Amino acid sequence: MSNEKIIADLQFLVTNLAQQADGHLIQSRVFAAKGFNKLAEKYAEHATEERGYVEKFIDRILDLGGKVKLENKKEGEVFENPIDWVKHDLQVSVDGLTWLKKVLDNAKDDLTTYDMLKVYYKDEESDMYWGDQQLEMIECIGVQNWIAQQI
């Protein structure tokens, strides 16, 4: 796999992960304003974590001799309903992991990038499982009980 393809994939991650971090921070503040303190804290931490990955991916682009771009981001939706948000975030994780699996396969000959992406993949997979678990919990205990747990 050429450095150009790896750099392009890392740049895609930088742009989209920065967007996700912004989205998670905004959702955190929306949830805090509504009194959903546990969700607010979770997504604030998640935004910080994602920014850390953005920094690592930027550094790797530079290590590979690439040029980092500050690309336009598409507009994202802000959710008022926490359950709608969890469903949306879960789908983003599912779709992202499918794409990331292909990127991992492409990066297998660049062990440093591969290892970085593998750590990120595991983290995103954990987030996906959390979202799925929350939706299962809502089915078991009901919406109101789940919402009460988020306060």
Which positions does each model-derived feature cover?
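Iron-associated oxidoreductase/ferritin-like identity signal
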Residues: 1-151
